[in-house]
Amino acid sequence: TGDNGCGGDIWLSQNAKFPDLIAEESVSKRAVVRAYGERAGINPCTLTPKDIFDIAEGTRDGNRLAAKESFAELGEVAGVAIAHALDMIDGIVIIGGGIAGASPYILPSMLEVLRGKLAMMDGQLFDRVEMKVFNWEDRAERNEFLNGHDQEVVSPISGRKVPYHSVRRTIIAVSEDGASTSTMKGAYAFALMHMDHQS
């Protein structure tokens, strides 16, 4: 949590697709249902996000392309909000909640945004975020994150060799525990850390 009790939530960020709305209007269960309904021409859409996931998987009848695109839209809007957060906070990103089960359809568009470019007026391009973004769910990328880019440099103050991360990096990971369990584990670890500092 932050100094004022904020938990690092980005739901109130500006929505990249609908700039007058908050990000949660495109990054939520209801957003997946709305996006699917719009693409499939179903109004009102009474399906659940799980139904739409099953359609995307091909295990339920429906418009597979619309189902995949509805999750991709979520990933794109979430990616923009996450990019803004990563521009200010040097950390890792954990995707959680029930919708995380659809990560195979969410992560590609999210990673595309996070690995994208932004331009200046003169056409000069910059990486969307300063860090190299690794997909923790991909074994090769996980190994590269864990094993690559480290080198030793000599400290100008002590003269000792110290480890140096030559590439700024972060990960995008999907919670396997669910939001409640992950929150509980984080709170427990936070409490233990503070107890250690007080003893």
Residue spans for each PLM region:
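ATP-binding/phosphotransfer module of carbohydrate and carboxylate kinases, centering on a glycine-rich
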Residues: 14-199
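A short, polar/charged loop-to-alpha-helix boundary motif
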Residues: 2-16
